[in-house]
């Protein structure tokens, strides 16, 4: 999640651990850590894997900096899916991690996950296109357009009416309206997850847990 400047021969890494929390690790090196490692590998787990395979580089210490404990004893399938999604993102900024942190400290309801999913995809510019109807795929000709919060995008006049009129490709307006409406339907949640899988060229195995 973060690379924290420390010393030429050491490096502090903040990583998301298997215990569903954040660990702060100190990497001790026998020689100066190459700059290409610090800049090329954005995921702490990848960098740690490289360091642990090279002579004179090893993890010196590790402490739990933060820990996120769900309200219920049993973990929600939405929580596993959220963690899998974030584990497959090449790099994350602080605002995206804050969305995950907020979800991990929530009650893990469908509504909580939907807020995370939509906010994250819009924040990372991974949302469905506003250039074609989300129902039939017909290309839009011009603005203004009718957009559906539940469908997650533009809806042409033949396929129904939306919840909001947009005068430009403005997902922030759609997101603000969505937050007032609440959770997605199961079909619409699946549609957004399909879009995310397509954008990331991957499949989320944890989706099976939602059935």
Predicted feature descriptions by range:
Residues 1-11, 16-211:
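Non-catalytic alpha-helical scaffolds and adjoining flexible linkers that form interface surfaces
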């Amino acid at each position: 999640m973060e690379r924290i400047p420390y010393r030429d021969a050491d490096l502090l890494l903040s990583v998301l651990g298997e215990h569903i929390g954040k660990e702060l690790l100190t990497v001790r090196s026998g020689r100066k850590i190459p700059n290409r490692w610090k800049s090329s590998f954005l995921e702490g787990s990848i960098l740690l894997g490289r360091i642990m395979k090279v002579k004179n580089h090893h993890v010196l210490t590790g402490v739990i900096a933060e820990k996120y404990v769900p309200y219920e004893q049993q973990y929600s399938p939405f929580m596993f899916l959220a963690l899998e999604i974030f584990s497959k993102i090449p790099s994350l900024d602080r605002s995206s991690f804050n969305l995950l942190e907020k979800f991990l400290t929530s009650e893990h309801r469908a509504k909580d996950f939907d807020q995370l999913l939509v906010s994250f995809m819009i924040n990372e510019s991974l949302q469905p296109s506003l250039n074609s109807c989300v129902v039939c795929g017909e290309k839009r000709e011009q603005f203004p357009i009718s957009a559906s919060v539940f469908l997650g995008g533009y809806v042409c006049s033949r396929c129904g009416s939306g919840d909001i009129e947009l005068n430009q490709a403005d997902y922030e307006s759609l997101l603000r309206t969505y937050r007032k409406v609440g959770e997605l339907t199961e079909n619409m949640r699946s549609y957004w997850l399909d879009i995310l899988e397509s954008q990331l060229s991957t499949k989320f195995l944890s989706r099976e847990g939602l059935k």
